[in-house]
Amino acid sequence: MFKHRFPILVTIGVVALGAAACSSSSSSSTTTVTTAQPGSSPGGALGGSADTSTPTVSLTGAGASSAQPFLTRAFYDYNRSNPNVTVNYSPTGSSVGISDIQANNVNFGQSEIPMSSSDLAKATGGPILQLPIDLGGVAISYNVPGTPKNLHLNGNQLAQIYLGKITDWHQIDSSIPSGIHIVAVHRADSSGPGYDLDQYLIDTSPTWVTATGTTTASKTWPEANVGIGQQLNSGVATYVKQTPGAIGFIEYSYALQNKFTNASLLNKAGAYVAPTTASIAAAGSHAANLSASNYNIVNGTGRGTYPLANFSWSLIYQKQKVINTGIALGKLLDWVSSTGQRNALPLGYAPLPANVQAVAHATLLKLEDSTGSALFSS
């Protein structure tokens, strides 16, 4: 049980979302939810009880669009027991989430890839804590009428599609009539899904490494001049949905929401595996000793493992200048990374494994006030 060291002067509230908040959304607009400190039901690991007589705390976050469906639903769920904390989350993309927390423009940033040492050095508010908040996957979704629903793709085929060397769907599957042009859709903004696919292609396709000239994955898509670039997961999803012949990489939650057909990918064990919550969970189960410097689970081991899986990370300042805000933020994120994981499966995410939840909790115990005193004791 998390115990705060300071008097609770406020609770966490979120603007009521109504029924719309209960469903995932591919919108790129800000999500506003009113939440409050978790009480005994459902109960947050940091303790505390809701007190609607105290002032409201407003929290702001920005970053990965991949996390938006889960965060929207988790914040809404949290609000039902904690009605006095407002959470405004803008799905602006991982790179913006990092730059916003660096500039101290938000209470928390969100990124599919943890901040690097050079990123951390640019933070204007002091040391930053990074904690895992959800476990998702990247689907390879395609829109080809009449295409087999169990299409299998390996890394070399994907590499040649995104290098513009394979341009007709008949080259992928002989059962598909020739003459259907492949439209390769990628992220125009720096993104976690782009990083994950780049890492998978580096691991599985020498052709990709030769063409891109790197053995280090990048959040910026390395072959931006091939195919069509779109902003955020919502942009890629919309383009794939509206364009016959299109293929794109999309957070699995968005693919599920749009009822896309997704390819099975060749994993390290030699099996073709489709994205499902079970195959994503299998990837997360191999995340031993997870940390912000040891986070990569792309192309992991295990026959049932989906190779494009990832954790999403919340980024917060260790020193919280406003105690009430820091307590509210810590309680919110501790609840989302534990009890709030009950919202994962219906939206296409896998719940965080117990050992990863423990990593998140231990990270939040490091929160301090401006003098260096701990905000929570356990």
Give, region by region, the residue ranges found by the protein language model.
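Flexible loop/hinge segments at secondary-structure junctions
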Residues: 23-24, 31-378
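Core hydrophobic alpha-helical membrane-spanning segments
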Residues: 12-14
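C-terminal motif of bacterial Sec signal peptides marking the signal peptidase cleavage site
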Residues: 16-21
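Bacterial N-terminal signal peptides that target proteins for export
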Residues: 1-9
